[in-house]
From Swiss-Prot:
<keyword id="KW-1003">Cell membrane</keyword>
<feature type="transmembrane region" description="Helical">
    <location>
        <begin position="357"/>
        <end position="377"/>
    </location>
</feature>
<dbReference type="GO" id="GO:0071555">
    <property type="term" value="P:cell wall organization"/>
</dbReference>
<dbReference type="GO" id="GO:0005886">
    <property type="term" value="C:plasma membrane"/>
</dbReference>
<feature type="transmembrane region" description="Helical">
    <location>
        <begin position="161"/>
        <end position="181"/>
    </location>
</feature>
<dbReference type="GO" id="GO:0051992">
    <property type="term" value="F:UDP-N-acetylmuramoyl-L-alanyl-D-glutamyl-meso-2,6-diaminopimelyl-D-alanyl-D-alanine:undecaprenyl-phosphate transferase activity"/>
</dbReference>
<dbReference type="Pfam" id="PF00953">
    <property type="entry name" value="Glycos_transf_4"/>
</dbReference>
<comment type="function">
    <text>Catalyzes the initial step of the lipid cycle reactions in the biosynthesis of the cell wall peptidoglycan: transfers peptidoglycan precursor phospho-MurNAc-pentapeptide from UDP-MurNAc-pentapeptide onto the lipid carrier undecaprenyl phosphate, yielding undecaprenyl-pyrophosphoryl-MurNAc-pentapeptide, known as lipid I.</text>
</comment>
<dbReference type="InterPro" id="IPR018480">
    <property type="entry name" value="PNAcMuramoyl-5peptid_Trfase_CS"/>
</dbReference>
<feature type="transmembrane region" description="Helical">
    <location>
        <begin position="259"/>
        <end position="279"/>
    </location>
</feature>
<keyword id="KW-0133">Cell shape</keyword>
<keyword id="KW-0573">Peptidoglycan synthesis</keyword>
<keyword id="KW-0132">Cell division</keyword>
<keyword id="KW-0961">Cell wall biogenesis/degradation</keyword>
<keyword id="KW-0812">Transmembrane</keyword>
<feature type="transmembrane region" description="Helical">
    <location>
        <begin position="283"/>
        <end position="303"/>
    </location>
</feature>
<feature type="transmembrane region" description="Helical">
    <location>
        <begin position="26"/>
        <end position="46"/>
    </location>
</feature>
């Protein structure tokens, strides 16, 4: 918004020329989101406490250390989303369809998570929105955003249906990390949309499963946001006519550098939230935060053409999800459990690990995986 309002005035005030540079707006968005989160955090937490909007999502078989957390203010993800939305709308180029796609999916998944949290709080139970309904809504959000923001429609009066689908603004090819595109670069065609839906929903639900300890989900989330900031800038930026994507032999995506503003906003809002979510947490993000942030990260994987590389980057989230799948499969087929409790972070709790130790070690692993994902840019 500021880019569109103030940059045209640069001929009168040369200082405003900085708005033309994505790098400046990326930093500004991150700082804005961080300041907003830090300033509004205490107000939000106190309001949630007064309204008694506390966590009810405590399982009967949960470790004893979690039972004392019942009643901790929840739905802190709403604060994250507000900070992200404000910072993105202020500093991003709002003519960029990629920015709108990422932001709308994030907010759409936030609305789903908000509904889930509200049902849990109002009914005083941990069930919330039915799983099938949640899945249908998640699919619907991605499909609607894809056709609204990422496809080209042309108006032709001579056709029976005047609006004609022309093509997609998203490259329908996929690549593998560490594998040259000349060896693996298939065009998925009409199968790409279902694949895109799967990536976004899987990432969203994986972050949701990881959000079980204080700061456990938000830590890897901010690491992923910074990684995608770098990946999006490499994919779209040109410096004095020099393309970073061409040099590194990764897909060139014009306009992708603007996604750095969105990623920086997530980073800033996430760090601010971590200030209040670190052990022992003063507030939980709730499904409104975990589903939304996961959806946003999933969209970043799609828009920067790192769908498979995101499996490395999101290794912590993936491990948590796989642990649940294996636990359910083993119990249903053999009657035995592989882990003491799933997701796997609870397994380590029951083994006697202190909660802060689990959290910090998972953060360290997420940083290591992010570095491996970044290596995949060059090693192809």
């Amino acid at each position: 918004m500021l880019y569109h309002l103030l940059y045209p005035l640069a001929y009168k005030l040369s200082l405003l020329n900085v708005l033309r540079y994505p790098s400046f707006r990326i930093v500004a968005a991150g700082l804005t989101a961080m300041v907003l989160g830090l300033l509004l955090g205490p107000i939000f937490i106190e309001r949630m406490r007064v309204l008694q909007y506390g966590s009810t999502n405590v399982r009967e078989d949960t470790p004893d250390t979690h039972k004392k957390k019942a009643g901790t203010p929840s739905m802190g993800g709403a604060l994250i989303l507000a900070s992200v939305a404000i910072a993105t709308l202020l500093f991003a180029d709002l003519a960029n369809r990629f920015v709108w796609a990422a932001l709308l999916v994030t907010l759409g998944y936030g609305a789903i998570g908000f509904t889930d949290d509200w049902l849990k709080i109002s009914k005083k139970n941990s069930k919330g929105l039915a799983g099938k309904k949640k899945l249908v809504l998640q699919v619907l959000v991605v499909v609607v955003v894809y056709y609204a923001c990422l496809t080209d429609w042309r108006f032709h009066v001579e056709h029976r249906f005047p609006w004609v689908f022309v093509g997609s603004y998203v490259d329908l090819h996929v690549t593998l990390p560490f594998v040259p595109s000349r060896l693996f670069n298939p065009d998925l065609g009409f199968l790409y949309l279902p694949f895109m839906v799967f990536v976004v929903i899987a990432t969203s639900n994986a972050v949701n499963l990881t959000d079980g300890l204080d700061g456990l989900a938000i830590g890897p989330t901010v690491v992923s946001a910074m990684t995608f900031l770098a990946l999006s800038y490499v994919a779209g930026a040109t410096i004095a006519g020099f393309s970073l994507a061409e040099y590194l032999r990764v897909p060139y995506i014009p306009g992708a550098e603007e996604l750095g503003v969105f990623c920086s906003a997530i980073f800033g809002a996430g760090v601010a939230f971590l200030w209040y979510n670190t052990y022992p947490a003063s507030v939980f993000m709730g499904d409104v935060g975990s589903l939304a942030l996961g959806g946003g990260l999933g969209m970043m994987a799609v828009l920067t053409k790192n769908e498979f590389a995101s499996a490395i980057l999101h290794g912590v989230f993936l491990t948590e999800t796989v642990s649940v799948i294996l636990q359910v499969w083993s119990f249903k087929t053999t009657g035995k459990r592989i882990f003491r409790m799933a997701p796997i972070h609870h397994h380590y709790e029951l083994k006697g690990w202190a909660e802060p130790k689990i959290i910090v070690r998972f953060w360290i692993i997420s940083v290591m995986l992010a570095l491996v994902a970044l290596l995949s840019i060059k090693l192809r």
